[in-house]
Amino acid sequence: MATSGRLLCLCLVLGLVFESLGHPGARLPKDGKRAVSTRHAHDDPFAHEVNCGGFPCMFSCCENDVCMELNCEYFPSLGQ
């Protein structure tokens, strides 16, 4: 019984620690700016992003407006 109580306390403490490390939920900070820049994919020469029906597909191909990661008939080269 004592072991299960200790395990429960450990889980609660770890939950509080991990919650305090970042923003809880998917909301923006109060200044309206994102905490992490989304331009890192555009700066990486090896990143591959395809516009697929208005949604970006990273490291995959777009067939019939659906992101496919397997069974791609055509996969554009990274140099384009």
From Swiss-Prot:
Cellular component aspect of the GO annotation: extracellular region
| Location(s) in or outside the cell | Secreted
Which cysteine residues pair off into disulfide bonds? Answer: none
Q: Does the keyword Cytoplasm apply?
A: no
Question: In Gene Ontology terms, what is one molecular function of this protein?
Answer: toxin activity
The entry's free-text remark on domains says: The cysteine framework is VI/VII (C-C-CC-C-C).
Family statement: Belongs to the teretoxin M (TM) superfamily.
Q: Which UniProt keywords apply?
A: Cleavage on pair of basic residues, Disulfide bond, Secreted, Signal, Toxin
Q: Return the protein name.
A: Teretoxin Tan6.1
